[in-house]
Amino acid sequence: MIARKWAAAGVALGLMAASPAFAGPECQNGQDFPRWLDGVRREAAAAGISQATIQAALGPVQFDPGIVKRDRGQGVFQQTFLQFAGRMVSADRMSRGGALLKSQAALLGRIEQKFGVPAPVLVAFWGLETDFGSDKGKYPIFTSLATLAYDCRRPDFFRPELIDALRIVEKGDLTPGQMVGDWAGEAGHMMMTPTDYDRSGVDFDGDGRRDVINSVPDALASGASLLVHFGWKRGEPWLQEVRVPADLPWDQADLAIRHPRAQWARWGVAAAHGSLPADGQPASLLLPMGRNGPAFLAYPNFQAFLGWNKAFVYATTAAYYATRLSGAPPVSPGNGPITPLTTEQVRELQGLLVRRGFSREQPDGRIGNATRSAVKQAQMRYGLPADSYPTADLIERLRGG
């Protein structure tokens, strides 16, 4: 199971391991939890939620220090795209995903007809999030969300999630006892946050309830609805592996920059398999491991993967897995040896980027969008290929000023 949405609150859950530097200051709020929970009850009532729902859902809730410990224990480990994709897009997961594409073909076809999201995309998320429903979590969601909303780190993020979880019960979609999921409050086959569930949940089996935990039709259709919310466009591609030349203008390899496929073709970019139409379809060049690693054209629909999970490696892996389920062969490792930076090297790099004026972000050991952007600026300053991928060579240049 991979917790995902909380990345929007500054945490890339699921792509992390213990790191004291990320844990932040201790926070002791447990003594006043009952009084705080009374405030949540009042807020929920003001939002139109009945006292019966409030009591049923929040009555059994107690502060769980184990949830806080898990949250505090989330730090960073570095995995490259090839490492993460190699682990997550395993032969077993390919086999089971392919089998589900066949056994659930009728359902997936109806969902695609309604929402425009292809079956391989939904099955890819289903596999990555809960291993096709086999690991949906065991934590009482109201206890998890109340604990995280009360904790001092991100109350403004989790408190609305708690209120939206109450809305789900109020609408009759699930009972409080059925609201069981990940320790961070996500639920169901597709691991939806309560806010996403309440906004994008779909009753696709026609029983009058939107049940993303127990109903596969509801869960998959809700996932498709959520992707549409994140900008998915019917009938458009999302990711295509390509080969890149040695003399490409690397500063154009940026998700914020799009060019027509015809322009990429003029620069020597070619499809890794099949052909690359030299047309006006816009695409960004995605280099998850720099110019010597795998290369993809990321189409506008790739933004829906980033909407689902802002963690760059996860989003790329999900999109790649969907292409594999669509029939694409395994990705090429690229053109040359790549030595990923360690977590300590990333922290040093980030500190140097701040010192040299390329960034204002506090070093945290994570290679996120801000670090990649700062790396690109530094590469351009020092005359290095500006592919946004951090290297030991760049660290040496930054050390020297």
Across the structure, where does each feature detected by a protein language model lie?
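Low-complexity, glycine/alanine/valine/leucine- and proline-rich hydrophobic stretches
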Residues: 300-301
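Sec/Tat signal peptide C-region and signal peptidase I cleavage site
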Residues: 19-23
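A general alpha-helix detector
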Residues: 36-43, 107, 144, 349, ...
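Short acidic, glycine/serine/threonine-rich helix-capping segments at coil-helix boundaries
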Residues: 339-346, 354-398
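Catalytic glycan-binding domains that act on GlcNAc-containing polysaccharides
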Residues: 49-280, 293-296, 305-322, 327-343, ...
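N-terminal secretory signal peptides that target proteins for export/translocation
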Residues: 1-3
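Bacterial N-terminal signal peptides
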Residues: 8-18
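Mature N-terminal segment immediately following signal peptide/propeptide cleavage
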Residues: 29-56
